[in-house]
Amino acid sequence: MKYILMTLPLAAVVVASLMTAQERPNMTAAETGPARAVRVEATVKAPISEVWRVWTTSHGAEEFFAEKANIRLAIGGPYEIQFDPKDERSGTKGLKILSYAPEEMISFQWNAPPEMPEVRNGGTWVVVQMRPEGTDRTHVTVTHLGWKEGLEWDRAYVHFTRGWGDLMKRLERRFTDGPIDWNKERMMYQESRERKS
């Protein structure tokens, strides 16, 4: 993936500078106000119909996004992702689909982890856009919007700058290696946390 960086808050620049070239998603971001956004892009080796399926169905999302999902493709339908099936707080329970255009875009409400309560209930949203590149590749852009000002918002911004980049890497892996093995993913995550502490 190619790395693009426009004006980022200092904290996001620090996070981006800590990533190796391999870890960096193709990302851009606006600094403040209504235009402030986390944006990541990737081109995956899959036809648009398959990319659409993994973003808009429960089973599809469970192949790359999280271990459990509840998605019903309808305006106001659920877009619920459960990152840790044993901890109901670790997901997006109660969040809804805002809009969609088949095989072009979907937007949905989003929240932050429970340890960021101000942002968790702050009303952000995500827009996923996709376009075919030939018959066997799809370009995907994820834009996370609705950011406000404040220290907790800045922390969440840094969190999601990395998080959406990680998600796009899993999306790419889904189409090169098959559905994500969540047991293996949890072990790798735990090992990573232990190395950092």
Regions found by a protein language model. Give the residues of each.
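Beta-strand/loop substructures that line and gate deep hydrophobic ligand-binding cavities in soluble
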Residues: 116-162
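Short beta-edge strand/loop motif at the mouth of beta-sheet-based domains
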Residues: 59-94, 103-105, 184-186, 190-193
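Bacterial N-terminal signal peptides
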Residues: 7-17
